[in-house]
Design a protein with these regions (language model features):
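Bacterial N-terminal signal peptides
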Residues: 7-16
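Active-site metal-coordination/substrate-binding segment of hydrolases
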Residues: 91-161
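Histidine/acidic-residue-rich, glycine-tolerant segments that coordinate divalent metal ions
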Residues: 154-235
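Second-shell loop/turn segments in exported
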Residues: 39-47, 124-130, 204, 224-230, ...
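Acidic/histidine-rich, surface-exposed loop or edge segments in extracytoplasmic proteins
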Residues: 31-42, 219-222, 354-366
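An extended, acidic, His-containing surface patch that forms the Zn2+-binding/catalytic region
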Residues: 89-91, 194-196, 201, 254-317, ...
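N-terminal helical capping/dimerization or prosegment-like subdomains
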Residues: 23-107, 325, 329, 340-341
Length: 457
């Protein structure tokens, strides 16, 4: 198979030869946008997402965007946001993705009020300061700066912000359906760089795939009866047997372009026995020793195939009665490209008991990984290496879902290319005292400016 990086050197050379351009957005402006964004509590149920969308519209209109360039679409108590920087051609547009909503935060558990942004000791504290308002602020600031500069992209650039990515993704689905004819999408809610605790950059991760999140319900029903008269058929026992089979089962190892390209780079980073196993698996996905080593490591087991684990069990209705019903939830993270129904059928085969019904959660959506486009890889390489020369860039597949899931599902290649570089010890997304380093803002702005100018021309 031809390497996805075969045309990369040429593409990178062409990009590097591009003429100098105006400076990225002002870090002070971007910081204000971030702080103002965090101050609006866009948690599900508070109805504040439209307010944040209106704020972003105001920022962009002040830079020269017109009313016709911006569309805010209310959906229930939330909304979606779209802003278009028109291109000079009729070629397919480039999408920028992010989300305006945040997860809930209980003020009594935080050191500071999560919705009163505070700049302290080099950080901006507050819910959403990292996920996802940091890169959203950088994208909004960059779009505004491009407009001010009079930049004329060949391809239109459309900034799309969802309003319920953290929950139902209704706005995400609507945006994906509306903009399914795009060339590709760049998502600020995926990827990004890791800074070591010594302050040195370690690597940059480019997210090009997501495992499908799917829940399956196992259900056994019996007539029941008095516990003093036990029968050979017991719903809890039958369910327990099925769960034991699932717990002992391993889905067949799989490989895709992301693991073939990314695993050897990860292997060089981690070293040791697991590094050797990752490198061996990338070279030969049938290597049983490598499979055994990776399967035994919780950090990497999800990178080589589908995983399914029991997460909830319910059964019985009284202490002195035979159970009439027993259920369990099986949470699966499905390898990109594998159909949800195929996993359900495989679970049924593993259980091998027709008394155990296997039902699929209807909300699950499957999507394949995105191809590693040479133009995207070259642009990301240029942007990252401008900040950290020679830094490893690792194509990756995440276990959690972002808006990219629904865009990939409708055929839009999507790449997580966040501009944020941070230490692992600074990452508190969804957690207490979430924060973002102020020092990361200038580099993130340069990152987005470079990507958008290079990929849209």
């Amino acid at each position: 198979m031809r390497s996805p990086f075969a045309p990369l050197a040429l593409a990178a050379a062409l990009i590097a030869a591009a003429p100098a351009h105006a400076k990225p957005a002002d870090p002070a402006v971007a910081k204000k946008i971030l702080i103002d964004s965090v101050a609006i509590p866009t948690v599900e149920g508070r109805g504040k997402v439209p307010e944040l969308a209106a704020y972003y519209a105001g920022v962009l209109k002040a830079a020269g965007f017109t009313d016709a360039d911006i569309v805010i679409t209310p959906i229930g108590e939330t909304a979606s946001f779209a802003a278009t920087l028109k291109g000079t051609s009729a070629e397919k547009p480039i999408l920028l993705l992010g989300h305006m909503d945040v997860v809930e935060a209980d003020a009594k558990d935080w050191t500071r009020d999560p919705f009163v942004p505070v700049e302290e000791k080099g950080y901006i504290f507050g819910r959403g300061s990292e996920d996802n308002k940091f890169d959203v602020a950088m994208m909004v600031a960059t779009m505004a700066q491009l407009k001010k500069d009079g930049f004329k992209p060949r391809r239109s650039i459309i900034l799309l912000l969802s309003g319920d990515e953290e929950t139902a993704m209704v706005t995400t689905r609507a945006l994906a359906a509306q903009y399914k004819d795009a060339e590709f999408a760049l998502n600020g809610d995926g990827g990004g760089g890791l800074i070591g605790e010594d302050g040195k950059a370690k690597y940059y991760g480019l997210q090009a795939g997501e495992k499908t999140y799917a829940d399956f319900t196992l259900e056994v029903t019996n007539p029941g009866g008095h516990s003093s008269r036990p029968s050979a058929i017991n719903a809890i026992v039958q369910l327990s047997t099925a769960l034991a089979k699932i717990g002992a089962y391993h889905f067949a190892p799989q490989q895709n372009e992301l693991t073939r390209v990314g695993m050897p780079i990860v292997a060089d980073q981690v070293g040791g026995d697991i590094g050797a196993a990752l490198k061996a698996f990338a070279a030969n996905p049938a290597d049983t020793a490598a499979i055994a080593a990776i399967t035994a490591d919780p950090e990497y087991v999800g990178q080589i195939g589908t995983t399914c684990v029991p997460t909830l069990v319910k059964g019985g209705h009284a202490e002195n009665a035979l159970p009439q019903r027993a259920t369990a939830n099986i949470n699966c993270r499905i390898f990109p490209g594998v159909e949800i129904e195929a996993v359900r059928a495989e679970l049924e085969k593993v259980i091998a008991d027709p008394a155990v019904a296997v039902k699929t959660d209807p909300d699950a959506t499957a999507s394949d990984a995105s191809p590693l486009r040479p133009d995207v890889m070259a642009a990301v390489t240029k942007a990252v290496h401008a900040r950290f020369p020679g830094l490893p860039i690792i194509p990756s597949m995440s276990a959690g879902a972002t808006d990219s899931l629904h865009f990939r599902a409708v055929g839009v290649p999507s790449y997580g290319v966040a501009g944020l570089f941070s230490k692992a010890s600074d990452s508190f997304a969804h957690g207490l005292n979430e924060r973002a380093p102020v020092a990361a803002i200038p580099g993130a702005l340069a990152h987005w400016d470079s990507l958008l100018r290079d990929l849209s021309k």
